Amino acid sequence: MWRSAWVNTCFDLEGPHETLRAVVRGGAAAAPPELRAIIEQAPLDSVARAAIDRELFEGHCGKLPAEMVPGMRAAQELRDASMAEALLTAAKGGGPAWLIAGDGHVRADMAVPRMLRRVAPGKTLLIVGVVERGTEAAVPGPEAARQYQVLIVTPPAAREDPCASL
């Protein structure tokens, strides 16, 4: 049985909530020092920042106030840094470490792999994207190649429009 609470606890994805709130308000400067160091070693370029901002805005059904977007991006970077740190810790024994996460966290151009390449350039990464047919990422070409080394395209999942109830 899938236990997302276990995953959230292992990677500390949910918090502590006060840290996430502080980062949303104050940016990476409010992050714990070890995670701030990872974020600072792997700064986002303007293209990646704009892409994350767009995804955050669209992912919140266009309802996210513009002034909150930079803080939400900082929280996304905090989660990515936390996952990168967990992977580096897990790989210290010399064996492989795996991250199974949403595509926003596994993109090579703006998420955990980008951070790992900066803070641990000698590590070998294999970045697999699993995306739904019909999404921008599912289109083979230069954009997909920047994001993943292996791309698996699946049929779209049946779901209600989450924005319809807003």
Predicted regions and their residues:
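A substrate-binding/cap region within the structured catalytic cores of diverse enzymes
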Residues: 1-90
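Solvent-exposed loop/turn segments at secondary-structure junctions
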Residues: 6, 12-16, 103-107, 132-135
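N-terminal start-of-chain detector that recognizes signal peptides
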Residues: 70-71, 98-101
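C-terminal regions of proteins
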Residues: 82, 88-91, 95-98, 105-166
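A structural signal for short, well-ordered beta-strand segments and their strand-loop junctions
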Residues: 5-10, 99-100, 127
